[in-house]
């Protein structure tokens, strides 16, 4: 009897260790499920309103609202590759209209009504420091982080009201 109880005790101890080990594996596995992919994209936009204020120092404060369609590649399954975005930007321009700093915020939504708030900017006169980052999301974008580099893609219309912006960066799901 004593040896049976000892075996039973050893078995229970082994079973507890096995259960604890499996629970640990599942807990760590949930951390591993977060996935980061590189996405690229192009925004095709139209400036809807522009307000320019010449300041006493000769610089110009520019405020724009725009609408753009974002076409992306490299997204994880379940995330549509097209988004509709409503954005606002503010920039300070020199008397020669060189960029002295620009910042923007966008609300981007997909066909399901899910979306996120994206912000970005560029402090460089040649627009070489363009960056973006998501700050909040809802629906399938809740907990998703996006960040990367962007570049002005050029004007599409002669008056500059239609334009493109390209980007590449990380898209991390929770």
Can you say where each PLM-predicted feature lies in the sequence?
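Beta-strand-enriched cores of mature, soluble protein domains
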Residues: 33-174
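Short, Lys/Arg-enriched N-terminal segments with co-localized hydrophobic residues
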Residues: 1-11
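Sec/Tat signal peptide C-region and signal peptidase I cleavage site
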Residues: 11, 26-34
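Bacterial N-terminal signal peptides that target proteins for export
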Residues: 10-19
